[in-house]
């Protein structure tokens, strides 16, 4: 059984002016997704800026979201690390806190080999008893999980899914062919329909932070056989999706949410605020779609 089908939001983490986590706003964001069509909440994925958090804060954010959701939707905890023992530690803690699943980015910077990937994920698999989503995002990590490697990983009982953000649809199709028991989620908002067309069952989405219903609807339309409606909505959203990635994620999505009145603060350094030129491009994309700007 899949961890979820549909749209999983890669939830942002709101910060106060002095950069502490704004738990009051975080609670409102969680409630927003509970009230809308979001199918799962991914806390402390890349969009949630866990690389800027010490472990105690990272785990407190995970705990808070799990408690707030209270079992109403699956909560998947981002606990990836390029240090295997650290990844194991965070995984065990997230499981203890009640996470429904774990999202693990591949080791980054030190990168490793395909053999190292298998050994890394085997250690994590053996340490927990909840589902693991492998996250392949070579543009950030410098490391690509090959389909043959994913086939080996699929033999591990807790490796249940992959978030595929390589941008290579042929590779996604090869994973679907070689790994029939692995659920595939698009890791790119501009490729939801293409990934679904080769066997995907959903998306882990940045876009869903601001348009949760529309993101869910793309997947629902496609999986219900309304392929043309899914395609039309995917294309209609493309200008906003492009604007959300005009600078490094999550800079634009946080700016968009602030424009919409969510008051999520700015990203932590080394990420910064948007340039004025790009901010105007983002603002125009939101207005053109019909989103109410409250600034």
From Swiss-Prot:
Keyword flag Lyase: yes
Family affiliation: Belongs to the DapA family.
Key words of the record: Amino-acid biosynthesis, Cytoplasm, Diaminopimelate biosynthesis, Lyase, Lysine biosynthesis, Schiff base
UniProt subunit comment: Homotetramer; dimer of dimers.
SMART domains: DHDPS (SM01130)
GO CC, one annotated term: cytosol
EC number: 4.3.3.7
Catalysed reactions, semicolon-separated: L-aspartate 4-semialdehyde + pyruvate = (2S,4S)-4-hydroxy-2,3,4,5-tetrahydrodipicolinate + H2O + H(+)
Claim: Transferase is one of the keywords in the record: no
NCBIfam families referenced in this protein's UniProt entry, alphabetically: dapA
Enzyme class: lyase
PROSITE patterns: DHDPS_2
GO biological processes: diaminopimelate biosynthetic process; lysine biosynthetic process via diaminopimelate
MF terms in GO: 4-hydroxy-tetrahydrodipicolinate synthase activity
Broad class of where this protein is predominantly found: cytoplasm
Site note Part of a proton relay during catalysis, residues: 46, 109
PANTHER family: 4-HYDROXY-2-OXOGLUTARATE ALDOLASE, MITOCHONDRIAL, DIHYDRODIPICOLINATE SYNTHASE
Catalytic residues, chain numbering: 135, 163
Gene that encodes the chain: dapA
Coiled-coil spans in chain: none
Compartments where located: Cytoplasm
The protein, known as: 4-hydroxy-tetrahydrodipicolinate synthase
Organism field: Caldicellulosiruptor saccharolyticus (strain ATCC 43494 / DSM 8903 / Tp8T 6331)
Gene3D superfamilies from the UniProt entry: Aldolase class I
């Amino acid at each position: 059984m899949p961890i979820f089908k549909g749209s999983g939001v890669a939830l942002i983490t709101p910060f106060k002016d002095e950069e502490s986590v704004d738990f009051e706003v975080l609670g409102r964001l969680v409630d927003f997704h509970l009230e809308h069509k979001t199918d799962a909440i991914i806390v402390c994925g890349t969009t949630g800026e866990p690389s800027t958090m010490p472990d105690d804060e990272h785990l407190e954010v995970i705990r808070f979201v799990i408690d707030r959701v209270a079992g109403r939707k699956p909560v998947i905890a981002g606990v990836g690390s390029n240090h295997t023992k650290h990844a194991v530690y965070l995984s065990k803690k997230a499981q203890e806190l009640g996470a429904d699943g774990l999202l693990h980015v591949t080791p980054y910077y030190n990168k490793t080999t395909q053999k190292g990937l298998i050994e890394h994920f085997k250690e994590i698999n053996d340490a927990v008893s909840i589902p693991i989503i492998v996250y392949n995002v070579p543009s950030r990590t410098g490391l690509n999980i090959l389909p043959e490697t994913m086939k080996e990983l699929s033999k591990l009982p807790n490796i249940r899914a992959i978030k595929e953000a390589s941008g290579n649809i042929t590779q996604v199709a090869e994973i679907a062919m070689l790994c029939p028991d692995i659920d595939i989620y698009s890791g790119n908002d501009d490729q939801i329909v293409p990934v679904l067309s080769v066997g995907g069952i959903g998306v882990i989405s940045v876009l869903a932070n601001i348009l949760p219903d529309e993101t869910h609807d793309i997947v629902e339309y496609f999986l219900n056989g309304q392929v043309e409606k899914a395609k039309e909505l995917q294309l209609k959203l493309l200008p906003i999706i492009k604007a959300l990635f005009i600078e490094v994620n999550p800079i634009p999505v946080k700016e968009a949410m602030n424009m919409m009145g969510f008051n999520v603060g700015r990203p932590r350094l080394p990420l910064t605020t948007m340039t004025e030129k790009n901010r105007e491009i983002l603002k125009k994309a939101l207005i053109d779609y019909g989103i109410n700007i409250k600034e």
